[in-house]
């Protein structure tokens, strides 16, 4: 990125060039002085320079402060000087020979120590500071041309500080034709083979020093060593070939912040097909931000304790050590960590040896890793304790957490299922887990739910710690699925890694899909892959992918900011949905064998999507089927969006239907605005499964491959009284529409005997109908007519699908005058089932009895709908339970509905209840309880309390950074707080963007959550005006937000009157 003041620096440099001769003497004096300077580690790092360091800028005003500093005079220059002495004083031939010999010896000496006297990125020129210094030495540089060849000659006057450079690339007129440091990707000329990384952590002032030795293979001759580095203060760089050839002279080095690379400029070209050893000594901060090597804290027995932990994915390893920070550059790692003996350290591999020192420090040396990428390297320094178990194959599994959490047994559930999951994946993939151990680390603060570091997976506490006495089934399910996801990554992502970030779905899509497959292994009765996958993955991502601003699951990465952008729900959830579709049309057993081959062939390496397609095609071929997987799947992965299939009965020919496909877009007007869509007529090869049925019978399933825009097909047994149903059990990633006659027949079937259709088909019909109506493909009454059958529905999934589909419609209508008509209609559909199911017993403890899961989740869903839409009995019950808790100080609220009761009570009752929940939020130590208490505070109808909570959310000592986003989003979902959250978001945007900007996934979640239910012309105008002043990395998220709000406004303009008219008639009959 361009830095402030860059043009001014160039002008100033031109002036300095004119004065160079006059200043030469002064420069040489300053160079000599600079060679002697050193300072204590990061003396000013936490002071004025800290802001510049954190912002990634140089933090310097001196022109060319980043340029290369002093290096020793070359051999040629010394020889020239001695020749002039010979000529001037007519020295004898013997004297000349003696001087020449001396010059040769000096030349060798300078070559050996050349790197020691070179300048450093983030460090200083002309001799290195002592170990631990900050490298703040004078010097700036330019290239001089003389008879002896090119060299970097420093100019005195610059001052480098931690996180800045003391060297900079040459000016435009001096640059070489090809500059490897300006490219997004590393050149590939060099490949790392092995890293020796030695760290010393100073937890008392949150700094660390490091020494990294990298063995690199030179593939193509080059004069530059370019690797990633950011926010590190480099003190010293050395390069050597091997013992026979010795040191390689270094001319200088500089940091290029636009691409976050360290460039080492050499005096000679490295030879291809040779190996070299690069040594870098550096210092850095243990950051307060949640990326790189960062710090977190917790309170134990009234004392605040700190820990250091890493988050390197996708591009943050470079903030902890200079490295080749791209997934393709796999290498082995040997890590050593020196820390105070009061702490323990963890990394990907087990500790091999620990060396204790008399001064209270210890150095842990970890075993060497297998080949791996930098982004899932990890380490941690903490005061935690652990529990452990061992798998059948001998893998040691440990869970590390705060001592009080371990003592309570909060990590026991995670430890238990992790052991089982490793055994499951080893059997399913037929590839053993590759490391001797797997540590699970629960930390108070983390930018994501979890990170799959190989052998050291890191989780935020809320996604791994579970206290059975206060945790609901819903919370247990969340914890389970996060753990299943991360353990899958030990194979998909860690063992086999995508070549580049454009195919991040190859790891995230598989891990997300296996969340449901792995949970089915743990709890077979839950039917996660066949049922819950629909509502939690398919329906959710199709909402996002139905926008004109969506993108393909495989998307180009053209600049550094694009890398963070690819980690979104399209990669995770659409990737998972496409994998599920692929597994279903291939057949699960063939698909499984294909995955086994894929992992075996590419283990410890990298793979691209074509490698997967080829392996799966071969698996099909061995099974006697010939499908070109790449041809089919490229259309689904390289095109954005998805199709809507429309099945029309042919009125002129019996047993004939017409099938059409078109790109589904929620807002048709957005399609005409998007240039990328105007000239594209997307087509997909669609595996359409189809059945014919009537009131008592359903035919066997048939598959039709639809590849054209319009096709005619003959269907057996299709008569006037029969209905058609497409995309059976919603295994395909598309929607299905029908003519109105067929919709009427399907609605009639649901009302007369819904069990003729499977649970998944019933849920699929509900979601398709609501989405098609929202986009204008169907009349608004069709989905509302479908849900009339729900009073007879006994299964959880259709209720869950209906609840999710009604939610955005409710938010579009909840601030309108005649909202009560919609509210009354929904209550009418819920009332019968609410009375039948009742409330859970007080003694229900969230047991994992599989038979109760579906029933308890159904009961919870119906109670939530009843309380949300104002059922009087539900409100009374919630108020009674809250009042009993306050008066008795005993919480007898059933676990599985606590969040509903807390929210309803805060909404209905007075400020004292809000204050009581606020007090309980502060006093509880159970992370699951803390989360639902905080969210309950956002349910208040009191705008003053909501404003108070929004302001408190910015205090990290009160609300954790990752929880603050949820607070703001939940206030925005409250009709009494939507405008407050929207105003707060705009007023505090600079603070929020600074806090979450680099964690783009969190920033996108915040932008979407605050804006998704804005639906007035005024709010749309405010959003567009706000966007005019912002063009940062979250610009794509704002574009999606604008499209969403435009679609909301358009729907209200076109359809709200139609909806209310129908509702009014329906309630009168």
From Swiss-Prot:
Subcellular locations according to the entry: Membrane
GO cellular component: cytoplasm; extracellular exosome; extracellular space; membrane; plasma membrane
Cytoplasmic side: 1-85
Transmembrane segments annotated in the record for this chain: 86-106
Annotated residues for binding of Zn(2+): 485, 489, 508
Catalytic activity: Release of the N-terminal pyroglutamyl group from pGlu-|-His-Xaa tripeptides and pGlu-|-His-Xaa-Gly tetrapeptides
Class of this enzyme: hydrolase
Membrane topology listed for this record: Single-pass type II membrane protein
Subunit record text: Homodimer; disulfide-linked.
Protein name: Thyrotropin-releasing hormone-degrading ectoenzyme
Organism: Homo sapiens (Human)
Gene: TRHDE
